[in-house]
Design a protein with these regions (language model features):
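N-terminal Rossmann-like NAD(P)+-binding domain of SDR-like oxidoreductases, especially those catalyzing
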Residues: 1-182, 222
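C-terminal substrate-binding subdomain of Rossmann-fold SDR/epimerase-dehydratase oxidoreductases
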Residues: 28, 57, 194, 200-286
Length: 286
């Protein structure tokens, strides 16, 4: 039995689909409080499967989490549940600390109480900060120091450190993966690629921060899910694994490509004031 938190979100739902197909004998339990970014209809293809269960609760609700663990006695817990939008974290950091750090602590306490084979924390390469644009030879590795830029990445880094502390202090069998920017089906349209596609299809302006020179390493979500599957089954306990796409592109080039593919004019592109503390480049060591 695997509990997948945040399974109604973008990456979590794709992971559930992957696991149901790759491991049809597994029982999958999705725990999700259905924030604005969660969509229950995404899970429609698996809702009626006998080996799937959906539970609408928050990972910050200790009683609800313990009740679920008592009922299901999971072997593996994979934590996707997170507030993940940098802009929202700049405006309202507190909810990020609550979900991303406190929620992680509640899950790990439940894992300690009920005993599990593996707890996996899904994290982000944003915990490493950013890289200079003029040094394309530099990449993030698992040894890169944590150097966060936003309240979002700080909350994820705090959770990662807590996970490693639970491993060292209590012997909890944990692994962590840090991924680059994901894209693919069921992506909530506040992030760059789905937002630009949705706006372009409706002939709305395509807002690009600053000059759009910021570089991101793009990872297809299904590739990410396969990597997590591998880590939870074969990864070494206590280790951090970076998962990258080796697919760097400037934001402006992504937007121009979307215009080209959709047959829309680049005149829709609108340059807006840059994000506060905007990271220049993310890239994971290939």
């Amino acid at each position: 039995t695997i509990i997948v938190t945040g399974g109604a979100g973008f990456i979590g739902s794709n992971f559930i689909f992957h696991m149901m197909e790759a491991h049809p004998d597994y029982r999958i339990v999705c725990l999700d409080c259905l924030t604005y970014a969660g969509n229950l209809s995404t899970l429609a293809p698996v809702m009626d499967k006998p080996n799937f269960r959906f539970v609408k609760e928050s990972i910050t609700d200790r009683d609800a989490v313990y009740k679920l663990f008592e009922e299901e006695h999971p072997d593996i817990v994979v934590n996707f549940a997170a507030e993940s939008h940098v802009d929202r974290s700049i405006e309202n950091p507190e909810v990020f600390l609550d979900t991303n750090i406190k929620g992680t602590a509640v899950l790990m306490d439940a894992c300690r109480k009920y005993g599990i084979q593996r707890y996996h924390q899904v994290s982000t390469d944003e915990v490493y900060g950013d890289l200079p644009l003029d040094r394309p030879d530099l990449f993030f590795t698992e040894e890169t120091p944590i150097h966060t830029s936003s309240p979002y990445s700080s909350s994820k880094a705090g959770a990662d450190l807590l996970v490693l502390a639970y491993h060292r202090t209590y012997g909890l069998p944990v692994t962590i993966s840090r991924c680059s920017n994901n894209y693919g089906p069921y992506h909530f349209p506040e992030k760059l690629i789905p937002l630009m596609i949705a706006n372009a299809l409706n002939d709305k302006p395509l807002p690009v921060y600053g000059k759009g020179e910021n570089v991101r390493d793009w990872l297809y979500v299904e590739d990410h899910c396969r990597a997590i599957d591998l880590i939870i089954h074969k990864g070494r306990v206590g280790e951090v694994y970076n998962v990258g796409g080796h697919n760097e592109m400037k934001n402006i080039d992504i937007v121009k490509l979307i215009c080209k593919e959709l047959g829309k004019p680049e005149s829709l592109i609108t340059h807006v004031a840059d994000r506060k503390g905007h990271d220049m480049r993310y890239a994971i060591d290939p």
